[in-house]
Amino acid sequence: MKKTPIIFALLLFVFCFSAIATSYAAENRPRFFHEGDGRLKLASEKNNYTFDGAYRLGDGYDETALKAIHRVFDAPFDPAFPKVSLRLIAFLDFLEDRLHPGARLTITSGYRSPEYNTRVRARGGLAAKASLHQYGMAADFVMDGVASAKVWHFVQALDFGGAGYYHGRTVHVDVGPARSWDEKTSGVSTGISDDNKLIGMITDFDVYRPGDTVTMRFIRMTAFPIGVAPVFFLEGRNTDRHAGKALLFEPVFAVPIEGRCPLFDNIDQMAMIRWQLPARLPPGRYAVRARFCGEIMEKMPPEVATPTFEVARP
């Protein structure tokens, strides 16, 4: 798989993202199941950058604010290919609003490139091979006025996201699958994620409308190349008559694909996968399922599905 990006596709993503974000924010409709009031106070312990203000405004997500937040996370900023997940930003906001409104979060570890994550592991650091820091979906932090143990227990009770606590001053929080661990149960050095055993897929938001563009990405990969069947499935997750019905579709990938089993070589190639929801899609709960193809490793699942998302009424 060549690394040449589809520039037009990325420009189209920026346009669609801006239009959708503006439409929802103007009507004050939530985009995530766990989000706060749209304001955060952040500081980086690593590079001393700070952010204090609103990142979600009446006319959408503020690009200047998101750029500043990326700096705090030590992540490069590209509006066409954001490195820090909006879902993570919204979840940190959610935690701050409920545990200590207005508190500052000091980020001790934010975004990590795959190369940097590998270096951390090589020098014996507690970095998972499939770390969600590589996807901008995780943060280690300290919340002013709140014990990290309290944050850990609070996230555990939500049954959403990951929470790790090593009985020190910081806590790890991510927006991956619901799970929790400490220094005795982290499994970092056990090979738990080898051979793509934990591979998954997510959507960019939790709430959409018919006709919106859904942007998907695969996460927690540990071995490449990976073959992905170019036909995905939209499946109902309701209890009504739409439950279980699948709609086949071909999404647009971030890189050119060829054949019935295109191969992908890195994390970035398996991000920015887009598809426009049908304009007449009935409101309800859905998930997208994708199948792998070619040589599938023994521990790797043959297919994965996104967490359930909601399609609201127009």
Regions found by a protein language model. Give the residues of each.
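Active-site acidic/histidine clusters and adjacent loop/turn architecture
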Residues: 46-108
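Bacterial N-terminal signal peptides
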Residues: 9-18
